[in-house]
Each structure stands twice: as structure tokens, then as C-alpha cells.
Regions:
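Accessory alpha-helical/coil subdomains and C-terminal extensions
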Residues: 1-121
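C-terminal non-catalytic interaction/assembly regions of soluble proteins
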Residues: 83-175
Length: 175
């Protein structure tokens, strides 16, 4: 969700880790926090050194027998495109010249690549886009929605046009 924007993946990973603190684990049954924890978060804003990550994840796999990765859909695109094109495959692009992410499927590419590099027998890729787009809004979402609409109406009634959103520097709603 967001070709070049990893904030949702990063925020989801942060929320996931905070929820792990409240879970009960049974290490004697191989159900430990470490096995459920995140080993990597890949977002488009940060370049991924695939070779170095493969080595790091192999080490994690050897230590805990599993690897959990949160991947933003636009992460690592340059590496994927480079590999595909160097092997003679055509990379399809949309009318704007953007790589068609649904065609190259970054999640599957990373799964295939890393499973080979870390000697994993099983791989599970869960694409959150469908769940995120269809999820019921939580209280935090609803509060932001109502605050945004209240501000938008207030600005419109005062003759002020623009876009309503949270100012990242001041962490407040602005128009």
C-alpha cells in the first residue's frame, strides 16, 4: 500500500511488536517471543543490501529456526528489477513508467530469494493490503477521521482551501 511509502509497514511492525509484550508464550513448547518477533522490516525509503541481509537472516534462521519479515510493497524494487532484467526477463511498466508491482510480486520474490539463501523449507507470504483496505477502523482511526472532517468543514466555512492532514513537524492537524 504505497509504492514508495513504507510508513504503513513500519507503523504496523511497531504496533505488532508492542502487542507481543502482552502475549503469553510457552518457550518449553518452542513458542517463544523470539520466534514471533520481527527479524527485518523492509521499506522503500531504505536501500536493502540483499547479500548482507541474506547472511544476517541466515544467522537468525540458524539461531531460532524461523525468520519473520515485514515488507512494504515497494521495498527492494531496484534489486528485483535489476536481477530480472539481467536474466533477460522483461519488466512490465504502467503508462507512467512505474514497474507493475503486481507483475513482479515483491513478496514472492523476497520469499523465493531468501528461502534459498537461508535454507528454508517452508515459506508463508501474507499480503496485508487486502486486510488493511477492508479492515474496520479502530478508535484511533475514527478519532482522526472525525478531527479531519471537523477541520475540513471549519476551513471551508472560513473560505480556506487546502488539504487537511497532520503536520509531521508539529504533530498537529492543519489545513
Amino acid at each position: 500500500m504505497g509504492r514508495n511509502c513504507g510508513w504503513l509497514t513500519a507503523a504496523t511492525a511497531q504496533e505488532y511488536r508492542s502487542r507481543l509484550k502482552n502475549r503469553k508464550f510457552l518457550p518449553s513448547f518452542l513458542i517463544s517471543k523470539e520466534r514471533w518477533d520481527i527479524d527485518a522490516v523492509y521499506i522503500p525509503e531504505i536501500k536493502i543490501n540483499i547479500k548482507a541481509e541474506s547472511r544476517r537472516l541466515k544467522k537468525r534462521m540458524d539461531e531460532k529456526d524461523s525468520v519473520n519479515i515485514f515488507l512494504s510493497e515497494g521495498a527492494g524494487i531496484e534489486s528485483i528489477v535489476s536481477e530480472l532484467e539481467s536474466s533477460g526477463q522483461q519488466v512490465l511498466r504502467d503508462a507512467f513508467g512505474h514497474v507493475r508491482l503486481d507483475e513482479i510480486n515483491p513478496g514472492q520474490w523476497f520469499a523465493k530469494h531468501f528461502s534459498k539463501e537461508i535454507n528454508s523449507d517452508k515459506v508463508l507470504v501474507q499480503k496485508s493490503g487486502y486486510f488493511a483496505r477492508s479492515a474496520k477502523p479502530n478508535k484511533k482511526d475514527l478519532d482522526l477521521i472525525f478531527q479531519s472532517t471537523d477541520m475540513a468543514v471549519s476551513c471551508a466555512l472560513n473560505g480556506q482551501s487546502g488539504v487537511v492532514g497532520i503536520d509531521e513537524d508539529q504533530d498537529q492537524l492543519q489545513c
